[in-house]
A protein has these predicted regions:
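N-terminal Rossmann-like dinucleotide-binding module
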Residues: 2-82, 358
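Contiguous beta-strand/loop segments that form the cofactor/metal-binding neighborhood of enzyme cores
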Residues: 2-3, 218-289, 319-329, 359
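Beta-loop-alpha module in the N-terminal Rossmann-like domain of NAD(P)-dependent dehydrogenases
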Residues: 53, 85-145
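Hydrophobic residues in well-ordered beta-strands that form the structural core
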Residues: 88, 128, 153-155, 283
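A contiguous active-site-proximal alpha/beta segment in oxidoreductase catalytic domains
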Residues: 133-192
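Glycine-rich "substrate-gating" loop/helix at the edge of Rossmann-like oxidoreductase active sites
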Residues: 203-210, 235-239
Length: 360
């Protein structure tokens, strides 16, 4: 055998081994992430996040059973791209199907309540992208519809589902770090001023608070003992009137404080700092974080905590809904956090006299 052919054979063997290892990793991920019985999933909406979800599921061996979109051509293209089993002629047809158990709702914020009503009344479990609704009243309505129809409603905000946060919250609640005193978070993205896109268009429920602030407030609420009752804030509007930059200060009955800085028109690190008596916890890129650094107060030593995988963020979201359907009480309780966060966001926008067209 020539040297070249021998190398080719070795390369082929190595490639085959890599494929086998990847398959084993995917199977292991499925076993680790999905512990409850699988549901048959339909996706409503075919935007960026829906495509990310489809890719995340494919990477761990799961598929989507159906898709529907207001534009049929987009649904067909989505199905072809992600090997979706069936394209429905309309969203109503998908919701009427007895071949779909649960839906992942990815349409713009201001349409969520429309499809939540339809899906929940159709007896479908719903995983709804953030921001789950526009305001507290809508979320309470959706919660009641879920209760009446015996189905689960869940917020897809990744903070609620990442294994890292479940681990850190458990350690905080066990008192390992002492009382949490202060939480500081930054979240900044630079978005060009396109007044027709979802970031700045009030007709698409644009603005920093509902788009990125929901992450910051959700993280903060996870580590607070109770809902903040003192709320101070300032907001700078974009030319369209939606909030472009927000500064938020919160305090609860226990004296725990939260300081948040949010902007859609300046880049800054997505950084969270949770400060307690015995240590502080730093988390970078926190919306889908899998790593945190703990610095101990007494000796300055650092501990790296790594739990889960950022790449599996959306798979964790879907797995939690399936766990809730199977009776997991902790997964079912996540909506309480979402309700507190929505209450805060509604209060903040009321303070700013900032209502969306649907609310006026």
């Amino acid at each position: 055998m020539s040297k070249t052919s021998g190398q080719t054979s070795q390369n082929a063997t190595s490639a085959a081994q890599n494929v086998a290892c990847a398959a084993q990793d995917a199977a292991s991920a499925v076993d680790t992430i999905f512990t409850a019985p699988h549901l048959r999933w339909g996706v409503i909406g075919c935007g960026v996040i829906a495509n990310q979800m489809a890719e995340a599921l494919a990477s761990v061996g799961r598929t989507i059973d159906g898709v529907a979109n207001r534009t049929q051509e987009k649904a067909v293209a989505f199905a072809q791209r992600h090997h979706v089993k069936r394209v429905y002629d309309s969203i109503d047809d998908l919701l009427a199907s007895d071949e779909i158990d649960a839906v992942y709702l990815t349409t713009p914020h201001n349409t969520h309540i429309i499809y939540l009503r339809k899906a929940l009344q159709a007896g479908k479990h719903v995983l709804c992208e953030k921001s789950i609704t526009l305001n507290s009243a809508e979320l309470l309505e959706a919660e009641e519809l879920a209760r009446q129809n015996g189905v689960q409603l869940m917020d897809a905000c990744t903070i609620l589902h990442m294994p890292l946060y479940k681990e850190l919250v458990s350690r905080v609640e066990a008192g390992e770090f002492g009382p949490v005193n202060l939480i500081q978070e930054n979240f900044g993205s630079y978005k060009e001023f396109d007044m027709e896109n979802r970031f700045f268009n009030p007709k698409l429920a644009g603005g920093a608070l509902l788009d990125i602030g929901v992450y910051s407030l959700t993280l903060a609420r996870l580590f607070l003992k109770s809902q903040p009752h003192d709320v101070l804030s300032m907001m700078n509007p974009a030319p369209t009137g939606v909030d472009q930059t927000d500064g938020i200060l919160l305090r609860n009955a226990e004296g725990q404080m939260v300081v948040l800085a949010l902007t859609l028109h300046s880049k800054q690190p997505k950084r969270a700092m949770i400060s307690a008596d015995k240590a502080f916890i730093e988390i970078m890129e926190y919306p889908r974080a899998d790593i945190a650094t703990i610095t101990w107060t007494d000796d300055g030593k650092q501990e790296k905590v790594q739990v889960g995988r950022t790449a599996n963020a959306l798979a964790y979201v879907l797995a939690d809904l399936e766990a809730a359907v199977a009776g997991d009480a902790s997964a079912q309780a996540q909506l309480e956090v979402s309700k507190d966060v929505m209450e805060l966001m509604t209060s903040l926008r009321n303070d700013w006299n900032f209502l969306y067209p649907e609310e006026q």
